[in-house]
Structure formats: structure tokens, C-alpha cells
């Protein structure tokens, strides 16, 4: 409040700016692809940051394994890709969220 009055115009301007930055971050995420791997590279899959699998490769040697082994390695590759997406998403949103006064370096992993 300035001089006892609430500055709605300033608040709306800041909200619009934050909304635009968040939309920009989401648009950037839509273009990102990550590759999850497991079994020393025997399973590789590529996903968008929106969790859509766009490619999967299985090493021919893996096909000699049991169904359970193959399923476990596919799950592990999916989990690997999801963890990468989560990290990237958090970084992008923190960057956009810095408008709230947060310091994005406070949450970086070392």
C-alpha cells in the first residue's frame, strides 16, 4: 500500500509479467527432449518434457533376456528420463519464479 492506497495497477502489471514468463518457460519445456537409459545403454528412450515417449531403442542382445528383465530395464529407463525432466522443469520454473524474489541458486544441486 502506498499512501494508504493499494496499487492495483502495479499488482496487475507484475502478475501479467509473471504469467508471461511462466508461459515462456512452459513453451521452452515443450521443445525439450531427454534420453533415459538403463542396462548400460541396452535400453534408451527419448521423452519430451511433457512425458511423451517419442523414441525407444532396445539392444538386440537384450531380447535374449527374460520378459521380466526387459520390463525392469524399460521401467528404469523411464524413471531415468522422468528424473531428468523433473530437474529441468524445476530449473526452468525457478528461473521464471525468480520474479517472486527467490534466488534460484539457493536450490541448485552441487
UniProtKB/Swiss-Prot annotation:
Q: Name one GO cellular component term.
A: bacterial nucleoid
Going by the UniProt record, its keywords in alphabetical order are: Cytoplasm, DNA-binding
Look up keyword Cytoplasm and say if it applies. Answer: yes
Against SUPFAM superfamilies, the record matches this protein to: YbaB-like
Q: Where in the cell is it found?
A: Cytoplasm, Nucleoid
Give the Gene Ontology MF terms in alphabetical order: DNA binding
The cross-references to PANTHER family, in alphabetical order and at most eight, read: NUCLEOID-ASSOCIATED PROTEIN YBAB
Task: Fetch the NCBIfam families from UniProt.
Answer: DNA_YbaB_EbfC
Cited function:
Binds to DNA and alters its conformation. May be involved in regulation of gene expression, nucleoid organization and DNA protection.
- Subunit relationships: Homodimer.
- Record family assignment: Belongs to the YbaB/EbfC family.
Q: What is this protein called?
A: Nucleoid-associated protein CBU_0656
